[in-house]
């Protein structure tokens, strides 16, 4: 319930951890339309991630994005670890690619949040264009959504996220939690930062028990997840007005969850 996954999904995860094979039950699966929708969205997100990664590695098409990431001092190994990608500034690049490569429907693409349908017409276009792409993962490294960051000041907003879907609930997700959870348990401490780059940079420098709120105020569900992994939280947010406000709110919520809380100023 805390991790917002169904009973069959929980059973599958626990069986995989214990190395116990589960019997196939195709009739049960076929009667669970929501589960089938979630599975389809996961496959679609995986296909999109591979596409975005290929664009970043493209010798010419991904050059501007690679130069930008190099200017932020990110190593190739870090980019690969997080499966960072690039969405070119075209209106239908992903849409065209996915429809060629799979039997996915336009409605599934809309439900995933990867494409947008114009309100006044039937026209559709890619949500992410001209942006660095951050795949957002659940606790088990399933890709549930995406964040995109523009590399040019004139392209606003600076950050753009997937809308909420069957897989992605923003208030229940922390960027990097899938990779950080073991280190958080080991240290019995979690470091909270604001953005994707903040979290990635910390890990690149050897600090592994770090997660990011991605510019939003910490929620009760996120705090509950953290409390299940550690007793102490350290908040390192920006020193601007918004950052100080987010730190104060996060402090209060974490204290309500009986955590030891420190704020770095």
Regions found by a protein language model. Give the residues of each.
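Short, basic/aromatic recognition patches
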Residues: 100-129, 178-189
